[in-house]
UniProtKB/Swiss-Prot annotation:
Tissues where this protein is expressed: Expressed by the venom duct.
Domain notes: The cysteine framework is IX (C-C-C-C-C-C).
Annotated InterPro entries: Kunitz_BPTI (IPR002223), Kunitz_BPTI_sf (IPR036880), TFPI/VKTCI-like (IPR050098)
Disulfide bonds: C7-C57, C16-C40, C32-C53
Sorted UniProt keywords: Disulfide bond, Protease inhibitor, Secreted, Serine protease inhibitor, Toxin
SUPFAM superfamilies recorded: BPTI-like
Protein name as annotated: Kunitz-type serine protease inhibitor conotoxin Cal9.1c
Main location: secreted
CDD domains: Kunitz-type
Length: 60
């Protein structure tokens, strides 16, 4: 997958319940948003920091 592909994926919180704060790119708004990740599964549209999300997706 390319970075563009990852950034176009919808955020998936996954089935677990760890409640980890992460950032994901919202292709509809064109912004990275803070969301809650369950800690397992999900997809590549998940970043530890806002900066990582912006660097990967914000202006692709």
């Amino acid at each position: 997958r390319t970075k563009r592909d990852v950034c176009e994926l919808p955020f998936e919180e996954g089935p677990c319940f760890a409640a980890i704060r992460v950032y994901a790119y919202n292709a509809e708004t064109g912004n990275c948003e803070q969301l809650t990740y369950g800690g397992c599964e999900g997809n590549g549209n998940r970043f530890a920091t806002l900066e990582d999300c912006d660097n990967a997706c914000a202006r692709y």
